[in-house]
Curated annotation (Swiss-Prot):
Its main location: endoplasmic reticulum. Homodimer. Component of the gamma-secretase complex, a complex composed of a presenilin homodimer (PSEN1 or PSEN2), nicastrin (NCSTN), APH1 (APH1A or APH1B) and PEN2. Such minimal complex is sufficient for secretase activity, although other components may exist. Interacts with DOCK3. Interacts with HERPUD1, FLNA and FLNB. The gene is Psen2. This is Presenilin-2. Residues 1-87, 160-166, 222-223, 271-358, 410-413, 435-448 are cytoplasmic. The keyword Nuclease does not apply.
Amino acid sequence: MLTFMASDSEEEVCDERTSLMSAESPTSRSCQDSRPGPEDGENTAQWRSQENEDDCEEDPDHYACSGVPGRPSGLEEELTLKYGAKHVIMLFVPVTLCMIVVVATIKSVRFYTEKNGQLIYTPFTEDTPSVGQRLLNSVLNTLIMISVIVVMTIFLVVLYKYRCYKFIHGWLIMSSLMLLFLFTYIYLGEVFKTYNVAMDYPTLFLAVWNFGAVGMVCIHWKGPLVLQQAYLIVISALMALVFIKYLPEWSAWVILGAISVYDLVAVLCPKGPLRMLVETAQERNEPIFPALIYSSAMVWTVGMAKLDPSSQGALQLPYDPEMEEDSYDSFGEPSYPEAFEAPQPGYPGEEPEEEEERGVKLGLGDFIFYSVLVGKAAATGNGDWSTTLACFIAILIGLCLTLLLLAVFKKALPALPISITFGLIFYFSTDNLVRPFMDTLASHQLYI
């Protein structure tokens, strides 16, 4: 699920935050500059009369200085055009990188294409000549897998509802530890074995320790935004490789179709688990855990930086019921409105604060299942690049359409259904129609 977000915290921009990320959005005119000074007594009456005459002309900065909780529609369209294309590209790049890492690993490392085991969530084997029995086993595996996902999601919602934050943080930290240390060790070992690279165990352990420790700090505490994004991409790729290796072929395709339907229900249904998680977070005015979300802008949570004493005079927008449905982030985090500066006395040489950068958020589960689809196409598509490329393009087209619908409806949308549907259609049509057609043309030495 994804959406645009304005900010992730009700706090103003802090000194430590600006050291981690440079704001790229234009600065707004300060309130002091827009008001007449004490020495402009003769111009005060003229300024007030012009204010009455220019009621029809809407100045975006007037809202920021007066604290009026609203913006003209023209400014909203301008912001959509301004931030839309930029952040669509910023979302396409990590999705593409994650899928490239998975496909490159599948094509080069045989370990992830060898079938020597199954997950405990898919106990039914598909090693049977009967097509009906194989289809039945894949459906049963899918039911078990989706049931586990639903139960764990509801369990997470219950923990969050009863404020078991330490348990949730411990759960996420243990998962990150396993991915960044154990799975990275296995991955590096197989890569070194494939390319015949000699490596002693102390050096390997030291490299894995440094990699994992930096990742834990960046994901669960604080660090540069680019480094945090890189670690989230690596985690998604490692998890996708595990699914590709241990999910049976037919079960993988059925699970991909079922998980897209579940994503649709969980996000849009009023009693969906993710929607309930979002509503609880909005009631408490709290952010969702950043370890579950990829953000194209800084995900700023409480405790990551100290408050600047000079930023205590900010006024927040009042609660708006219509804004509640349109402020969900990619994994259920509320996107809080921007803070408006309260009018304060002007001081010479005072610089206006920079506006916080907007961004797009996408759940890590979307990264994982995008990569699973492309990786399965690369592993089971008889090594044909046309099938892999078709699935890759289909996912990007679906993601682009989802972002387009996001801009139209201005509400949170699930990111899996359109992309996964296009990917499945492109995979089976290319593998069963396009590839045989190309093979026939090549056998007759005909080129188009």
